[in-house]
Amino acid sequence: MVSSNQALLISPSIPYGEIAVPPSKSHSLRAILFASLSKGTSIIENCLFSPDSQTMLTACEKMGAHVRRIGDSLHIQGNPDPHHCHPPYFHMGNSGIALRFLTALSTLSPTPTLITGSHTLKRRPIAPLLSSLKQLGAHIRQKTSSSIPFTIHGPLSPGHVTISGQDSQYASALAITAALAPYPLSFSIENLKERPWFDLTLDWLHSLNISFLRDQDSLTFPGGQSLESFSYSVPGDYSSAAFLASFGLLSSSSKPTILRNLPSQDSQGDKLLFSLLKQLGAHILIEKHHIEMHPSSFSGGEIDMDPFIDALPILAVLCCFAKNPSRLYNALGAKDKESNRIEAIAHELQKMGGSVHPTRDGLYIEPSRLHGAVVDSHNDHRIAMALAVAGVHASSGQTLLCNTQCINKSFPHFVIAAQTLHANVRHYQADFPLRSSFCR
């Protein structure tokens, strides 16, 4: 695990090997939430334990769930009627999913709940979701119209609302709330982005026997439904797998990199990234439960980022090694993640010699030889791991990557995984705090 006083020192190396991909963050958080709202005891195997998972677990315990951890599994006795023991506040840490999902669920209770979180969470948009909840009757008091903190409570009124699709979590939050509401609710999504991630939420609801009608991007929930307990094993995280895959894809080794625990039928959005790379010429074998990467060259091109917008940082790194220029577009939502990922990855790769330029909704990237440099994560786990891949495949020089504690958000054992694949990534303990001015 990466601690707050450490950076990473990265040297050019030749990765290869075989490894199990860590559990999916998106599935883990949904599994915890749904188990906590179900009748009976649910068992979640192979759960990801990270700061976001702990945020969700703490919130669910406040709603009356009883949680036992046994090894890498969770036994959760749910509270199917959390409306009558709703907590006075939720601290969302730095979790965008917890912020959006629990904000919406709070409107099922008539008791006001304070929604707050870390300073960095204030940059995550919430206004479009609040606007739709207000139209359904939610009572909201806030100091600013765009961020935490605020208080919110219901009840909502039966009806129909239109919600922004600029971030798929808004629609997912409303779908989960409508699924559990005691009255009918329906909504239409305007210009849905990140569609695979919304579909992932609907897949969960369908698997838990929640009934709803869907007409393209309009959904109707009849009301009065509840969740039953379940057993579930969390699959590997395709988003995290993208970084491990990139170690192998860009390697000069003659040996493949094999990533296990990646079921091919899973609905995670970033799974589509691997199909894209195959289309661009990468030598990738997608099997039923694993993916095999062979070092290979590939083309750049015009790439619509919407299906896998979280992959923008690592795809920017990969495109530096493509045979021709690339334009990543339709990625406006990347500006509102843990960092402005468009600006952040361009700025840091430019330090390494990359020809990476922000555009209105993405990046323009020309093939470049990268070199080692002092770079910064911008406190964003995906920026950090993408830069680690860039450092491993730099043509010369070491890379000092600062502020790497953020990696714990989705991949606490990233350094161990990189080393397992023979990537020269190691902890660097500075004798002094690595200030932003030094790293940037």
From Swiss-Prot:
GO cellular component: cytoplasm
Residues that, per the record, bind 3-phosphoshikimate: 25-26, 30, 168-169, 310, 337
EC number: 2.5.1.19
One Pfam family here: EPSP_synthase
Residues reported to bind phosphoenolpyruvate: 25, 96, 124, 169, 341, 382, 409
Gene3D superfamilies (alphabetical): Enolpyruvate transferase domain
Molecular function in Gene Ontology: 3-phosphoshikimate 1-carboxyvinyltransferase activity
Catalytic activity: 3-phosphoshikimate + phosphoenolpyruvate = 5-O-(1-carboxyvinyl)-3-phosphoshikimate + phosphate
Matching NCBIfam families: aroA
Family named by the database record: Belongs to the EPSP synthase family.
Purpose of the protein: Catalyzes the transfer of the enolpyruvyl moiety of phosphoenolpyruvate (PEP) to the 5-hydroxyl of shikimate-3-phosphate (S3P) to produce enolpyruvyl shikimate-3-phosphate and inorganic phosphate.
Complex formation: Monomer.
Protein name per the record: 3-phosphoshikimate 1-carboxyvinyltransferase
Organism: Chlamydia trachomatis serovar L2 (strain ATCC VR-902B / DSM 19102 / 434/Bu)
Chain's gene name: aroA
